[in-house]
A protein has these predicted regions:
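Basic- and aromatic-enriched surface patches that contact anionic nucleotides/nucleic acids
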Residues: 2-14, 18, 22-40, 53-178
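A short, surface-exposed helix-loop junction/capping segment
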Residues: 46-54
């Protein structure tokens, strides 16, 4: 019985939140595109210049999904853009969309540790991955493959909310693209 009440109150809160979002004023937002390299993204993430906000979910990709994403970059395939909120007061950027991708690249290239079980981050040993990269850590890639991965550019859409004076655009954008 308590669980049902909790579910009902969650639904009511969610409805109220959606109504509040629907009644927001019009936004005044500046947005621009950028094409940072993977090297730039993981350096900024490592140094705390790009952060995961509380609204973002935790890391949820499994190793197969993460491996396929890295392989996509190694193959030269296009990947979705990331969304970053520019916070003028701190000079930081918050990841609105793209956390799984940025974290995967950071962990593979920078840490070399798979978050799921703290093992060495190797691409999966499966037919879904090109045999050239199958079961390899970043350090085991050829120098040209390492360079290709680090130099790969991922399009970023960066925005800065000017009005209203709260951060509601961040929530609106997050909710609409996720």
């Amino acid at each position: 019985m308590i669980q049902n009440n909790e579910s009902i109150s969650y639904d009511i809160i969610e409805e109220e939140r959606n109504e509040e979002l629907a009644n927001d004023d019009l936004f005044n937002i500046s947005s621009w595109g950028a094409d940072p390299s993977v090297r730039e993204l993981i350096t900024q993430y490592s140094e705390g210049d790009i952060e995961k906000p509380e609204l973002q979910r935790k890391y949820v990709w499994n190793k197969k999904v993460a491996s396929r994403f890295i392989e996509s970059l190694l193959l030269g395939l296009p990947v979705p853009s990331i969304f970053l909120a520019n916070i003028e007061s701190t000079g930081k950027r918050l990841i609105i969309d793209g956390y799984q991708r940025i974290r995967t690249l950071h962990d593979y290239i920078h840490d070399g540790i798979w978050r799921g079980d703290d093992s060495v981050f190797r691409l999966v040993d499966s037919n879904v991955i090109n045999k050239r990269w199958r079961n390899k850590t970043f350090s085991e890639l050829s120098e040209s493959d390492k360079r290709r991965l680090k130099n790969y550019t991922i399009h970023a859409i960066i925005f800065e909310q000017r009005r209203p004076a709260n951060d509601s655009a961040m929530f609106q954008i997050f909710e609409r693209i996720n």
